[in-house]
Amino acid sequence: MHAGVRGKKERAKFVWPLLGAGLLLAAEGVAWASGGGGEHGGGHLNWSDFLARTLVFVITFSILFKLLKKPIAGFFSSRKAEIQRLLSELELKQKEAEQNHAECKAKLAALEVETKKIVDELIAEGEVERQKIIEAAEKQADYLRQQADVAIQQEIKAAREKLKLEISELSVAAAEEILRKNMKAKDQDRLVRDFMKRVVEAK
């Protein structure tokens, strides 16, 4: 907004001097045209008129130079200052953009490091959990093996006891069968007497 107002003021400084210079040149042109007919009619150069026109031209040029010198110098000076200001702003924005880029790059690098750290921690935690599961499975397998060994030992012991009992029963039955076959009546009487005697002695 301020730049637009300043630009209008700068243009106004040029318009009025140019308008005045245009009026002077127009007046000089009219004077030149009015004097031109006499020159063509007479066929010789009118030095007084030539000098007057030259003087008017010099005065006009001097006035224009004086009027336009400062506005033109001011215009170019202001334009130079404006360009320098724009360049400074552009350089500042470029530095800000580079700084933002560097900050974003640093944040991205930090994010990558943090992400890798989290991934490594998760992998380590997973490895720990996996090791715990393996250890628990091994303990459970050992416990089951021990239980199986105990059960097998108990079954073996029971089988042995049963076998011993069966052998004892078979031995007794075989002995009874042998005794029945080989024992005579007098032997039976003797065994009965011995048994009764032991019973009496025990009492």
Swiss-Prot record:
Belongs to the ATPase B chain family. It is a single-pass membrane protein. The chain crosses the membrane at residues 14-34. This is ATP synthase subunit b. F-type ATPases have 2 components, F(1) - the catalytic core - and F(0) - the membrane proton channel. F(1) has five subunits: alpha(3), beta(3), gamma(1), delta(1), epsilon(1). F(0) has three main subunits: a(1), b(2) and c(10-14). The alpha and beta chains form an alternating ring which encloses part of the gamma chain. F(1) is attached to F(0) by a central stalk formed by the gamma and epsilon chains, while a peripheral stalk is formed by the delta and b chains. InterPro entries: ATP_synth_b/b'su_bac/chlpt, ATP_synthase_B_chain. It is found in: Cell inner membrane. One of its GO terms (cellular component) is proton-transporting ATP synthase complex. GO terms for molecular function: proton-transporting ATP synthase activity, rotational mechanism; proton-transporting ATPase activity, rotational mechanism. F(1)F(0) ATP synthase produces ATP from ADP in the presence of a proton or sodium gradient. F-type ATPases consist of two structural domains, F(1) containing the extramembraneous catalytic core and F(0) containing the membrane proton channel, linked together by a central stalk and a peripheral stalk. During catalysis, ATP synthesis in the catalytic domain of F(1) is coupled via a rotary mechanism of the central stalk subunits to proton translocation. Component of the F(0) channel, it forms part of the peripheral stalk, linking F(1) to F(0). It comes from Syntrophobacter fumaroxidans (strain DSM 10017 / MPOB). The keyword Transmembrane applies. It comes from the Bacteria. Keywords: ATP synthesis, Cell inner membrane, Cell membrane, CF(0), Hydrogen ion transport, Ion transport, Membrane, Transmembrane, Transmembrane helix, Transport.
